[in-house]
Amino acid sequence: MKFSIVINGAPWSSPSALSALQFAETVLDSGHDIYRLFFYQDGVLNSSCLCVPPQDEEDIPARWQALIESNDIDAVVCAASALKRGILDKAEEDRYDKSGHNLRQ
């Protein structure tokens, strides 16, 4: 079975991002495939490479990145949601004349 999963929750403001991550891990552990992950609304905050959680908390964005890379999953970040929340790639940094970018690659 193939799954597409939408992630709407920020990494630490609610349990939804971690729940979605654990669901995705279970899907893969059960022998199923993930067609695409779509980070939307506050879920785009999981794509920032600048998040630094307290030492006693899990690094949820890093776990998403590891899952995506180790399983070669197509991961899409909603551009409008990302821009609204200050998540930019290099092209958007240049386009909007900002001083940096923070989208995980």
Predicted regions and their residues:
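Glycine-rich loop at the start of a catalytic domain that most often binds anionic cofactors/ligands
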Residues: 47-55, 89-92
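N-terminal glycine-rich phosphate/adenylate-binding segment common to multiple enzyme folds
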Residues: 79-105
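Short internal beta-strands
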Residues: 35-41, 74-79
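Short, glycine-rich nucleotide/cofactor-binding loops
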Residues: 4-18, 47-52
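A glycine-rich helix N-cap at a beta->alpha junction
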Residues: 53-84
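Short, active-site-adjacent cap segments at secondary-structure transitions
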Residues: 44-47, 83-85
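Histidine-anchored nucleotide/phosphate-binding helix
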Residues: 17-30, 37
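Helix C-cap/helix->beta junction micro-motif
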Residues: 30-33, 71
